[in-house]
C-alpha cells in the first residue's frame, strides 16, 4: 500500500498552514528532500525510528531522521547512536552520517517535524507537520514491526502504536 490514501487528507488540511509558514523562508532540508523518508513504501517498513526535527546545520539535513548526506561527518547524536550500536551489539558505525543503508533494509527514519530554519532547532514545530507525521505513524500500527522511540517527543508517539512493540530510551543528543 501507498502512503497517499493515508496522508492525502491530512496534507490537504495542513498544507495551507505549512506553506504559509515556509513562504519566503529558508528551511532545511531542501524542498526535494522534505518527504524523503516517506519514499519508502508503507508495506516495506519493518522498523520505525522517530526523530524530532531535521538537523539545523546547513548541509546536514537530508530528509531522514538522524541521517546526513554521504560524506558528512556524523553529528553528535549519531555518534552516540553508533557508540551504542557498537557497545550493545558490536556493530561499527560509518565514517559518515549517511543512514541510507538502514532505509534500504526497511528502517523508516521519520522526524516528527519535517523542516527547520537553519540554525534554529525546533523552529517549525506546530505549523502542521506533527499532524502529517502522526497520520503516517498511525498507519504503521501493525505487525511485524517495531518502533524505536528516543526521547520525550518520540515517546509521545507510542500512543499511536498500540499494537507495535516499542523500545524507549533517552534521546541520543549529548545536549
Residue ranges of each PLM-predicted region?
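A polyanion-binding, active-site-adjacent surface
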Residues: 2-161, 165-175
